[in-house]
Regions:
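Conserved catalytic core of the tyrosine transesterase superfamily
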Residues: 1-317
Length: 317
């Protein structure tokens, strides 16, 4: 990797090549290890990768959050484990320094009424360019009804969307996996409507992307996120400053909606988690549990099921 310049450049490059060969995602480690390489150069560091160097790098920017610093440290620590195999002078770094907090920001589970308000705001975007509002409506609706990640939405190509069978092909997503995602009938109908308007508006467009802007190019994920935040603000769901509901919260809504549906139908929710994990593109179904936020509706349904269980004469031990 030509941009690496520290004394660790060669093993860093070999380490990242190994991760890629093993099928591991490398975007975040590459980013942090490039920064580590630059930091080591800045300090004119020579000698082994020490605990002090790794910790100083992790804490080098006082503006970073505690969790972000912890992540930087852990990435370097894993590299040090690799380095120790070839360089016995490399110490094993303490895994308990800068522990990553397990606390997560509570997610916002959009109600149907809140989603409708966002859709209304989307349709009012750019009155002189109605395709723009329809496009954002379609992208947001697809994420809400199918649980797609924001990168998966903007990454869809026309060939990935089968408007006849209602099937999406999600290619090489977050964990390097591809999967098929069946669409709800109402979502399919809306995507057909969008595709018809798009093709009529841009009949000579050669762009492969399914969702395009007026420049006849694919939307960037940052653009979709930024516009969505603005729509949520105008819909009264966010304040002018600070954190509020995000596009990714649509994915949480989808998972919770699935859970509520299964509870109401009397289906074994635990037994369905592997299927939901596959649908959402998780490697392990335990990752899916993060999305199953305890909403008031879920708690009420769980309490009702538990009461029915007691009424049937089961014994609690």
């Amino acid at each position: 990797m030509k941009s690496l310049r520290s004394m660790f450049a060669e093993p860093l490059s070999a380490y990242l090549d190994l991760r890629r060969a093993l099928g591991c995602r490398c975007e975040e480690p590459t980013f942090h290890l490039r920064s580590f390489d630059a930091y080591a150069c800045q300090r004119n560091h020579t000698g082994p990768l020490t605990q002090e160097l790794a910790l100083a790098f992790a804490l080098s920017n006082p503006k970073n959050s505690t969790n972000y610093c912890a992540r930087r440290y852990q990435v370097v620590r894993h590299f040090a484990e690799y380095l120790a195999i070839y360089d016995p002078t490399t110490p094993l770094l303490d895994p308990k320094i800068l522990p990553h907090s397990q606390a997560r920001t509570p997610r916002h589970i959009y109600t149907d009424e809140e989603l409708l308000r966002i859709f209304d705001e989307a349709r009012s975007l750019s009155p002189k360019n109605p395709v723009r509002g329809l496009t954002f409506h379609a992208m947001i609706g697809l994420a809400a009804s199918s649980g797609l990640r924001i990168g998966e939405v903007v990454g869809l190509d026309r060939g990935d969307v089968d408007l006849k069978t209602g099937m999406l092909l999600i290619r090489q997503s977050k964990f390097g996996k591809s999967r098929l995602v069946p669409l709800h009938s109402t979502t399919l109908d809306f995507l057909r409507k969008y595709a018809a308007v798009r093709d009529a508006s841009f009949p000579d467009c050669k762009e492969a992307a399914f969702f395009i802007h007026s420049g006849q190019r694919r939307y960037a994920r940052n653009t979709l996120q930024r516009v969505f935040v603005g729509l949520a603000f105008r819909a009264g769901l966010r304040g002018p400053k600070g954190r509020g509901p995000t596009f990714h919260d649509l994915r949480h809504r989808f998972a919770v909606k699935c859970l509520v549906t299964w509870y109401k139908a009397g289906i074994d929710v635990q037994g369905m988690l592997p299927a939901l994990a596959t649908y959402m593109g998780h490697v392990h179904y335990t990752d899916t549990a993060y999305y199953l936020t305890a909403t008031a509706e879920l708690l009420a349904l769980a309490a009702e099921r538990y009461q029915n269980w007691l009424d049937q004469g089961e014994v609690v031990s």
